[in-house]
Amino acid sequence: MDKNVTETTISANYGDFLLSAVEKAKDQFSDEEYKTLTADAEKIRAIEEQIAALAPADAAASSAAAQGTAFPQFEGSDLEGNPVDNSLFAGNAFTVVNFWFNGCKPCVEELDDLNALNEKVKAQGGEVVGINTETLDGSQQGIEAAKKLLATKGASYRNIYFASGSEAGKFALNIMAFPTTYVFDRDGNVVGQPLLGGIDKEENLAALQKNIDAALAKDSAK
């Protein structure tokens, strides 16, 4: 896994990262050690959730691209190896882009909701696209883990990756809170404010819908 991806993952959601790491290495610990490490990681995650609840807007603003900012040019692939680039935006009236990573519990919890949203917005000319930061640079370990999580949640919407050192990679790695979801217009420009948190929560879905409606209005006015 790319070093920058690891650093971003840990700083963004350390409790979830620890829980994931402990679970992967559970065979190396005694039952007592496993229970202790899991309990400690859960305490850290609980503290992080309390901190995040105090100032979620500040966390989003610290790494958010402003409205009208264009998504950087890129060439990459989806998780099945099919080539993809910025033309994906032009093919949609709007594109919902969700940034996530494998060890992020809130990210994984909303995967089925994102899949349902993708099915819904198809009729409006929209698409949901996922960008998992652990898959950047074509990391096979990250890709296989992401595909398993998506399959477990019954999610089949497109997920893509590109080089971490590209401008698009820097855009993704600049995000400091996960999950974060943007809406882009047909020209690849940000519409509204990014959404911090999962759309499995009603208020977050309402905020996302507001951005989608704005993108649709903009597209129909052309």
What is the meaning of each model-derived region?
Residues G91-T95, K122-V129, K153-R158, R186-N189:
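Loop/turn elements at helix/coil->beta-strand transitions in domains of secreted/extracellular proteins
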Residues V183-K222:
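Thiol-/selenol-based redox modules, centered on thioredoxin-like
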